[in-house]
Amino acid sequence: MIDFGNFYSLIAKNHLSHWLETLPAQIANWQREQQHGLFKQWSNAVEFLPEIKPYRLDLLHSVTAESEEPLSAGQIKRIETLMRNLMPWRKGPFSLYGVNIDTEWRSDWKWDRVLPHLSDLTGRTILDVGCGSGYHMWRMIGAGAHLAVGIDPTQLFLCQFEAVRKLLGNDQRAHLLPLGIEQLPALKAFDTVFSMGVLYHRRSPLEHLWQLKDQLVNEGELVLETLVIDGDENTVLVPGDRYAQMRNVYFIPSALALKNWLKKCGFVDIRIADVSVTTTEEQRRTEWMVTESLSDFLDPHDPSKTVEGYPAPKRAVLIARKP
């Protein structure tokens, strides 16, 4: 059973303590009623992983853990087999005692695009909305964050996160909660809030921006990364049934339109930090994610378009401040 007691004890002593008015009951309800049919299998994989304290831990340049003496072939095989029980691995990569998890996404590339534009993360309390397996949270800790809290309702991601955490020596500087942002009270407690790869899945994107703002302290920083299309401040794509084979894509604005949305929600100092086309080198099928990936979602005769005929995925990073 994945235990959230350490997180409750941690926030009981800091400025997130008011969250304890609602959080334990929400988690208890989740544990009682909402578990995926494979959750027991996934949580068993985490339980059977060995307790290891890394001799060398690098979260600044990657997510890498190494032992003082190389593990035996049998130990490595055990870790690899258990981690493969948690496939598909979408966000990473991870290098853990000789087991290299080559994930669908090169999330390190995204981090390299985002990091130069951030305010210094040293000592910050961070919320990562839609955090996936938690890769970027570990990189936030590597960049000096005091505490990274991720929320993502996908239960496989929770188990992947807990597996990595266990292999990082049960590191308590990052925590993942199986919640959506709509389940959070207006905490107004985080120095930096990240929302990366979430906005286009929201039926009401402006409501999502307000929800993000409600989590920030005054003067806090929002880091927003999402799909965009080319165009002026009035350009927004509303896809039909699917976009790049995804059913749950609702609004894809231009970067300039997104800037206006942020302004409408009361953010200031809004800047477009990066715009990049997603390549089939950054998102692809691997041994750790064996089903369809980006190359299958693009027009085989014109990779500048999706199979539905829309512009191929392009992503922007916008940085804004809550006054």
UniProtKB/Swiss-Prot annotation:
GO terms for molecular function: transferase activity, transferring alkyl or aryl (other than methyl) groups. It catalyses: carboxy-S-adenosyl-L-methionine + 5-hydroxyuridine(34) in tRNA = 5-carboxymethoxyuridine(34) in tRNA + S-adenosyl-L-homocysteine + H(+). Carboxy-S-adenosyl-L-methionine binds at residues 91, 105, 110, 130, 152-154, 181-182, 196, 200, 315. SUPFAM superfamilies: S-adenosyl-L-methionine-dependent methyltransferases (SSF53335). It holds the Pfam family Methyltransf_9. Keywords: Transferase, tRNA processing. The keyword ATP-binding does not apply. Belongs to the class I-like SAM-binding methyltransferase superfamily. CmoB family. Catalyzes carboxymethyl transfer from carboxy-S-adenosyl-L-methionine (Cx-SAM) to 5-hydroxyuridine (ho5U) to form 5-carboxymethoxyuridine (cmo5U) at position 34 in tRNAs. NCBIfam families: PRK15068.1, tRNA 5-methoxyuridine(34)/uridine 5-oxyacetic acid(34) synthase CmoB. HAMAP family: tRNA_carboxymethyltr_CmoB (MF_01590). This is tRNA U34 carboxymethyltransferase.
